[in-house]
Amino acid sequence: MKKILEVTGLKEQQVAPVVKGLSGLLADLQVYYSNLRGFHWNIRGAEFFVLHEQYEKMYDDLAGKIDEVAERILQLGGKPENRFSEYLKVAEVKEEHELVCAASTLKNVTDTLQIIMAKERAIAEVAGEAGDEVTVDLMIGFLSEQEKLVWMLSAYAAK
């Protein structure tokens, strides 16, 4: 059986930067996922019910995105990292464990999304240059959802 890239027509040297970008994104998404779980479990205060439920929706959605990124790395001939210790070495998103109030968790989420969205835009650009429209489409889909989420969270926080 032929290798995946032979069938798709993509060139390994052209998609190598895409794989590298996706690998960094995977690390950031995994740390973000862990942070969202912590926010869900530990949120306190008057907004508990709303944010407890919202953070659960967000980490459930993010689990699917993590899987899509890891599978795309495989489709491009790479090998996705699965060790959290390695994610922490390369992730720009940092672990959080002390945030429990609505304002601090919401700020962390929007700051994190800013990092992630910048990486997704960069990956989309590199993927476009490599002729990798599938990764471009994946990143655009993520960005579309995340931009809407940022708008909704900002509207909620502006009470």
UniProtKB/Swiss-Prot annotation:
Binding of Fe cation 1, residues: 40, 67, 71
Keywords: Cytoplasm, Iron, Metal-binding, Oxidoreductase
Binding site for Fe cation 2: 71
InterPro entries (alphabetical): DPS_DNA-bd, DPS_DNA-bd_CS, Ferritin-like, Ferritin-like_SF, Ferritin_DPS_dom
Entry annotated with the keyword Cytoplasm: yes
Enzyme Commission number(s) of this protein: 1.16.-.-
Top-level lineage group: Bacteria
GO cellular component, one term: cytoplasm
Class of the enzyme per the UniProt entry, highest EC level: oxidoreductase
PROSITE patterns tied to this protein: DPS_1 (PS00818), DPS_2 (PS00819)
Listed Gene3D superfamilies: 1.20.1260.10
Record keyword Metal-binding present: yes
Upregulation: Constitutively expressed but is up-regulated by exposure to atomospheric oxygen in an OxyR-dependent manner.
Subcellular locations according to the entry: Cytoplasm
Chief location category: cytoplasm
Molecular functions (GO terms): ferric iron binding; oxidoreductase activity, acting on metal ions
Self-association and partners: Homododecamer.
Family: Belongs to the Dps family.
Function: Responsible for protection of cells against peroxide, especially against hydrogen peroxide. Required for survival in host cells. Although it binds iron, it may not contribute to iron storage. The iron-loaded dps has DNA-binding activity.
Name assigned to this protein: DNA protection during starvation protein
Organism listed in the record: Porphyromonas gingivalis (strain ATCC BAA-308 / W83)
